[in-house]
Amino acid sequence: VTVSVLARTRARQWPLATAAAACLLSFIAFWVAQRLAHVNMLDVMVYRAEGETVRAGGDLYAMRATSANLAMTYPPFAGLLFVPLTFVGVPLMRTLATAGNLLLVVALVQLSLQLVRPSLSGTRLWRAALLVAAVVVWCEPVWTTLRYGQINLLIAVAVLWDFTRREGHRWAGVGIGLATAVKLTPGLFVVFLVIAGVLQWRRERRWNQWLRTAATATAVFLGTTLASALVLPYDSKRFWTETLFETGRVGFAEETANQSLRGVLARLMHTDDPGLWWLVVAVLFGAAAMALAVRAALRGDKALAVVVCAITALMVSPISWSHHWVWCVPLLVLLVDRRDRVRPRWTVGAVALVFASFALWWVPHDPGRPELDQNAGQMLLSGVYPLTIAALFVGYALTRRPQAVAKE
């Protein structure tokens, strides 16, 4: 269904009002489904507790919130951003968080379409965005993001906003800088921008869009981080010297929800710490994937470069919860747009099915940590996102190689 809607959106001339109505009906059904599922929006409750701790002048990184005893894992700047959540009651906060995330789904799709097909604009762009949003809201990463009240959609939108600005735009880089100040992982985009920018500078010997965006992102990140240090000096010192290196406070590596290479290896090796094996695999994969992203950027394929960089961050991060994978939305948009070049032809549908299937939750998962004793079939299901990406990368390499030989 997802692939069908994405593929035909451009051809079918739906009136904008009809597309908006379809999206609204889907979102209402989604809202009702989440209420019937009794979602607890656990993470937004943690965000609220972090904001309350900042207002009370407490210790951010000693704080524990909710019945799950969850700790603060983001930089101090995030705590400052969460203060406004304390100005409204919990029921209203949950409603606003859900409504805001639904709007961000539309924004994410709209920016993904702009990134992949810059010529799409005006009514055609918004019609497509609304129709696609009506479908992708039901995929597992988006569902889980709204279930917990997470900020993944906001992070992705901030990053994509930068990459869809026209060349030379003065504010390009602000989104990446702010996103990195909140969650650190988007900092890989800065690394990508610097590498691509330096290589292009060596070729042309002039300042370019990649370096400009990297400089802006770095300045925004440093500015917000320093400002946070002035407001929260103790918390800032503790985070950057201690908490940053305490990966265990985020969660167990082997958890089914951890859809990173480290999670796959932890379950494969029946351990909570895959150690050096993960580091080697992450470095090798990260280097190869970043080389692909930079190469795509230098030949003008910004969409492929951005999507590959985002996926790389998810793969090599120590913990990438399934709800972090909202980047499946621009990935699917890219695959559908280039479906004529994807082999085998059923690949696009298979990838869409992976993210819509909730397959990773089909295996035993509970506080007793059954993931440490998975069988082969359970390992395949619980590693479905990273394994799908690995298959896509291998398939891309195999299909590109014959093309390169043919050109020679």
Question: Where are the regions a protein language model picked out?
Answer:
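Central hydrophobic cores of alpha-helical transmembrane segments
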Residues: I176-A179, T216-F221, A305-I311, R345-S357
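Aromatic-enriched
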Residues: V336-E408
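Membrane-interface alpha helices of multi-pass inner-membrane proteins
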Residues: R170-V194, C309-V316
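Hydrophobic/aromatic-rich transmembrane helices and adjacent perimembrane loops
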Residues: S322-V336
